[in-house]
Amino acid sequence: MSARCGSQARTLYELCDQCNITLPTLQIDCVFCKTVLKTAEVLAFAFRELYVVWRDDFPHAACPRCLDLHGKVNQYRNFRYAAYAPTVEEETGLTILQVRIRCCKCHKPLSPVEKTNHIVKKTQFFKLKDSWTGYCLHCWKKCMEKGQRSETLC
């Protein structure tokens, strides 16, 4: 892939479109450990709507292992407080459905159903630095199976 190809791309979908390649054929390195992501890892990165990182005019993504590790480091370093949906809405000036909230475990954006799940189950969202996180349904289930409370980061 040319260093110039897709230099304005923010997502893997944009990168593939600008470079005229398909997502399954994309070969991209992890920004942290420098390994080449496997096809399933590339697809998972794209599904989570994560952003491409540019280093020395080349695009990078993150492998699942590094994504998990750096996500945990981010939680510990940048946790501010936990709050219920009305507080999130008051702070942002948006409805909870308009707020971009990512899963604190897998980093995918929460769907309206997943945000509503937090409200119905009276579970808090987490403020990490300048962004809000919560749990997607998949990670919620895994966290609950471990016997951890949903009011804490697991």
From Swiss-Prot:
InterPro entries found in the cross-reference section: E6, E6_sf
GO terms of biological process kind: DNA-templated transcription; regulation of DNA-templated transcription; symbiont-mediated perturbation of host apoptosis; symbiont-mediated perturbation of host ubiquitin-like protein modification; symbiont-mediated suppression of host innate immune response; symbiont-mediated suppression of host type I interferon-mediated signaling pathway
ZnF region ranges: unnamed: 30-66, 103-139
Record-level Gene Ontology MF annotations: DNA binding; zinc ion binding
Record's subcellular location: Host cytoplasm; Host nucleus
A Gene Ontology term for the protein's cellular component: host cell nucleus
Subunit structure: Forms homodimers. Interacts with ubiquitin-protein ligase UBE3A/E6-AP; this interaction stimulates UBE3A ubiquitin activity. Interacts with host TP53 and EP300; this interaction inhibits TP53 activity.
Miscellaneous section: Belongs to the low risk human alphapapillomavirus family. The cancer-causing human papillomavirus E6 protein has a unique carboxy terminal PDZ domain containing substrate but low risk E6s do not possess this domain.
Record function comment: Plays a major role in the induction and maintenance of cellular transformation. E6 associates with host UBE3A/E6-AP ubiquitin-protein ligase and modulates its activity. Sequesters tumor suppressor TP53 in the host cytoplasm and modulates its activity by interacting with host EP300 that results in the reduction of TP53 acetylation and activation. In turn, apoptosis induced by DNA damage is inhibited. E6 also protects host keratinocytes from apoptosis by mediating the degradation of host BAK1. May also inhibit host immune response.
UniProt record similarity statement: Belongs to the papillomaviridae E6 protein family.
Protein name: Protein E6
Species whose genome carries this gene: Human papillomavirus 40
